[in-house]
């Protein structure tokens, strides 16, 4: 299961050794897991109500992500009521953005979002 996350969407977007290392590290906790919550999550996306989100939001999707389609995420994005929001599609990445070969694109995007200066709502003449 864990190994397949790195090969399921677009083989070649991550180093196979990363998937192997992660799977090996996780295997010490056992080699079987209940699928209920995972299947529930993927079958019932989205798992949050976009109308209830009030904080700044960054949605990042890898070009080859096989979990949620671009259309799924755009539909979610357009339902958001928070004005401080961004939607980014990163090229050359699949679902595991932070572990892919092009992970620097993900980390750059995250840093830019977190470093975004606050919004100015009005000019005050001093």
What residues fall within each predicted segment?
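Catalytic histidine-centered segment of alpha/beta-hydrolase-like enzymes
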Residues: 87, 93-107
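Alpha/beta-hydrolase-fold serine-hydrolase catalytic core, especially in secreted/extracellular enzymes
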Residues: 83, 115-126
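Hydrophobic "lid"/C-terminal helical patch
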Residues: 110, 114
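Alpha/beta-hydrolase
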Residues: 1-58
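Conserved alpha/beta-hydrolase "acid-adjacent" motif
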Residues: 66-72
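Conserved strand-to-loop "acid loop" that flanks and positions the catalytic carboxylate
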Residues: 54-65, 91
């Amino acid at each position: 299961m864990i190994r397949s996350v790195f090969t399921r969407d677009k083989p070649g977007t991550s180093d196979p050794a990363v998937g192997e290392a992660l799977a090996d590290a996780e295997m010490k906790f056992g080699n079987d897991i209940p699928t209920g919550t995972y299947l529930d999550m993927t079958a019932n996306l989205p798992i949050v109500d976009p109308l209830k989100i009030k904080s700044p939001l960054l949605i990042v999707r890898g070009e080859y992500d096989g979990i949620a389609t671009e259309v799924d995420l755009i539909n979610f994005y357009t339902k958001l009521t928070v004005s401080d929001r961004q939607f980014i599609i990163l090229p050359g990445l699949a679902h595991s953005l932070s572990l892919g070969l092009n992970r620097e694109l993900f980390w750059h995007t995250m840093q830019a979002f977190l470093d975004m200066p606050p919004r100015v709502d009005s000019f005050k003449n001093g």
